[in-house]
């Protein structure tokens, strides 16, 4: 196992679990933080969430173990149909920003952020073109604040 494009890291409140967002595999790994080798897909780790609707980046973990993830780009059916594996998808996500815009632009109804329970259950999805591609996020009380690519104003959604 391994990660084809780690793009976000977040540590659980107890310090025992490191969450890793994987661009190439469109998943979130839960990796034991105390291990000698911290490899997603390796011994003792598990997928918290897989088959995500976009390419995950920003991660945040709340005290209760809820994991929030922001999607920088929408899933590209063309790329995934033509890429032989997660490594090539990870490489494509490192293209120039203008090329990425053309390949992965967020659709009007695209999901740009989600929240998962500690067990991996989907708790909520947030979307819409107005929100765009999320590059940073921060849950606080009854909101999730979102840093959106190309925007000067911080967006937020109610939890």
Describe each PLM feature range.
Residues 1-8, 29-52, 118-129:
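Blade-edge beta-strand/turn elements of extracellular beta-propeller
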Residues 1-17, 51-64, 109-112, 129-142:
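Beta-rich, blade/repeat-based domains predominating
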Residues 2, 11-12, 18-25, 68-73, ...:
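Conserved beta-strand positions in repeat-built beta-propeller and related beta-rich domains
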Residues 9-10, 30-32, 41, 79-81, ...:
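A short, polar/proline- and glycine-enriched secondary-structure boundary/capping micro-motif
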Residues 16-17, 36-42, 139, 146-147:
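Short, solvent-exposed loop/turn segments that connect beta-strands within catalytic domains
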Residues 26-28, 75-77, 113, 152-155:
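Structural signal for beta-propeller blades
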Residues 53-127:
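Loop/turn-rich, solvent-exposed surfaces of beta-rich toroidal or solenoidal domains
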Residues 68, 134-159:
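Blade-level signature of beta-propeller repeat domains, shared across WD40, Kelch, NHL, RCC1
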